[in-house]
Amino acid sequence: EDIRWAVPRIKQILKAMNVPVLQVDGYEADDVIGTIAHKAEKEGFEVYMATPDKDYGQLVTEHVFMYRPRHTGGFEKLGPQEVCEKYGLQNQLQVIDLLGLMGDSSDNIPGCKGVGEKTAIQLLQQFGSIDNLLASTDQLKGALQRKVQEQVEEIRFSRFLATIKTDVPIEFDAQSLIYQERDWEQLAPLYRELEFNSLLKQAPTLVANSQVSSKSTKKAKPQEATLDLFA
């Protein structure tokens, strides 16, 4: 609920920061990013996707990379070779099947209960894909065979959830994505209203010191300020 009320404010701030907002109704943000990344690559750009999410590994190519934060600080750059080495895969598209088997709680992908990363990697190394695995469950033994056979639909659904679309109906306009300076005339009042005081310190002095009466105005009209959240 909280994030739903915050979205309009987030968009206001991004607009004032001159950060483009790309969205398509009915599609996840991952799908929009996947589509834009591949369209940009086709136009000759080298693309970096800043994300910790494993599922983005399926999108990497020779010119599309993951820029993944490390737990110890800093970032790692992952291309096809790095993704395959990291997860013991033959090609980066196997990331989809890997997550379909092991799941990913951060992305609400259930996977096959009782199958962890190590087992999922072993299964993909042996069978190559979920389809081949499900067609060859007679080659499995004991508890593992039972787990896979009893969760066929869950595995297929998890693979669907792990798949990032790259055909979202959205145009790639490179010019509209060029970096622009923040519009402090719009941004400073928003920071002040939301009491983002540490961020407000980044504003140029004249802007930061202007409209000093904004707090008293906000206190005088609390209802108006609240209604803004529902715009």
Language model region names:
Residues 150, 160-231:
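Low-complexity, acidic/Ser/Thr- and charged residue-rich accessory regions of DNA metabolism proteins
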Residues 1-171:
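Extended two-metal-dependent nuclease catalytic cores across DNA- and RNA-processing enzymes
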